[in-house]
Amino acid sequence: GARWEVLVDAHTGDVLAFQDINQYAKRQITGGAYPLTSTEICPVPTQCGIMQSDAPMPFANTGLAAPNNFAGSAGVFEYAGGAATTTLNGRYIRMVDSCGAINASSPTGTIALGGVNGQHDCATPGFGGPGNTAASRSGFYELNKLAEQARGWLPGNAWLNAQMTANMNLNSTCNAFWNGSTVNFYRSGGGCRNTGELAAVFDHEWGHGMDDNDAAGALSNSSEGYADIAAIYRLQASCVGHGFFWTLNDGCGQTADGTGFNVNESETGLHCATDCSGVRDADWAKHSDNAPDTALGYVCTHCSVSTGPCGRQVHCAAAPVRQAAWDLVTRDLTAAPFGYDSQTAFIVGNKLFYQGSGNVGLWHACTCGASSSGCGATNGYMQWLTADDDNGSLADGTPHISAIFALMKLLSRTITADRVSIRAQSAAQVA
C-alpha cells in the first residue's frame, strides 16, 4: 500500500505537503507515427516519411486512477499495478477516428500501439481497435507536441489548457479544416494522400484554432498566414505538407524524391514550387522565379478576388506573410549582426509568433494598384515588434528590429517613409 509523508510547519502547525513516498515503476505508451509526411521514404529530414515505430503518445489516458490517469509529455506514467488502457482520449487531445474506436490495453502497463511503414487510411496493426490507424497515432503525437510548445510561450491560454478533438479519416479527400472547435482530416484519394498523415497539415489546422483562441479571440486576416507560420516554425520545414499532392499534377513536375508533384501556388497561371508537393512552400528561393512574393508584385497579379489581404484569396494572399516569417528565421536572424544558429533563430521566431500574433487583425494593409503597408497598430510587423520589445518603448528599437523588418520588406516597395524611420531605429539598436 501507499506510504504517506506529511510535512508540517513547526511554528504554525500548517501542513506544507502530503505525499505518497512509494517509488513506483514507470510505464510508457508508444505507437507508430509518420514524422513529417507519409511518403514511406526519408531522403532528407525535412521530407521524411518513414513511420517512426516507437513515438511517445504524449498525455495519453491510461485507464488508471488519478493522479496517474494521464501520461506525461513522453508518454510515461507511474505504474503501481493492474491493466492500463488507452483510447487516445488524452489530457489535451482527443482522437475520434471514422474507421472505428481506439482501445488498447496491457496487463503489464506498457502499451505499444504498433503500426508499420506503409499503413494508411483504415489499416491497423490488427489490435487496438479499428481506429488504431496511422492517422490517429500520428495526429495524437504531433498535435500534442505542437500544443505543448505553444503552452511554453502562452501558459495562461485557456484553450491550450483544455481538450481539443481531432477527427481522423473522414470520408472525403484532398482537404482538412478547422470548424471553430475541432480539427478535421480526410483519407487518401483524388490524387492526394491522407491529410491526417501529414504533420504540417495537422499543425496548420491547429494554427487556425490557435488564431481563433489567442488574445483577440478572432481569426486574423489572412489566418492562412498565421496557420502556415505555426506549421513551418514547429517543423522547421518550408514546405507545408510535403506529399499532399500524390498523383495530382498541376503542371509543375515531380518532386526530387519522386513521391509527388510540385504545387502551383498561382491562381492565374503558373508559379511553381521546385521541390514541394505540399500545399505551399514558404521559401521564395524554392519557387521557379526565385524571387519574393510581395503584396503588390505577386498577390495582386496572381491571386483571385476574395476577402484576404489586397482583396484577394486568403491562401494565395498569405504568401508575403509566410515568406517573411521564413526569411526571419532562416536568413535575417542567422545573418549579421545576429549570427544565430538555426535552433536559436527558431526559438526567437516562435517567441515572436506566439507572443506577438494574438492581437494581429490584418497582417498588412494593401490596395491593389495603389499601396501596401505593415505599419498599422494591429498589423503583424508592429505586433511582433511589440513582442520583441525589452523596455516598454519602440522609440529606441527592439533587440531584433532589423531582422523583424523581413515582415515588412516582402509586403511592398512603396513605403519609403516608413522604411527610413525603421532603418534609423535598427541602426541605433544593433550598433
Over which residues does each language-model region extend?
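Zymogen propeptides/activation segments of proteases
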Residues: 1-202, 206-431
